[in-house]
């Protein structure tokens, strides 16, 4: 499958490829797909998996205890003073992770009053060095999903 990935795809400002798994229905395989894609790509590329789902299944299935996270994807959006290196977790799965848990549930509500709220994730990812960023979204149409699309 790695051979099937074409190099002429759309790339971000820093040549990073972003793949967002989005579906407004739960239980359709977003998390399983996100983890599988991250695992496969990490065999050849530097990969970051971002868990935006408050259930934290991508986090837990990446071997990280979602109940004991120092920082979550909530901090990614709401605390821009934190360096990305502080939020990113190195996993033993071959890819890095920004984890999630129930604390992420109110993140979208807290973004409503922020300027350029749809571009926060794009801005935060701008200066990190990954070949691929895989984003596992929750089954909600909210500002986190919009950030994953932009």
Q: For the regions a protein language model found, what residue spans apply to each?
A:
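P-loop NTP-binding core
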Residues: 1-150
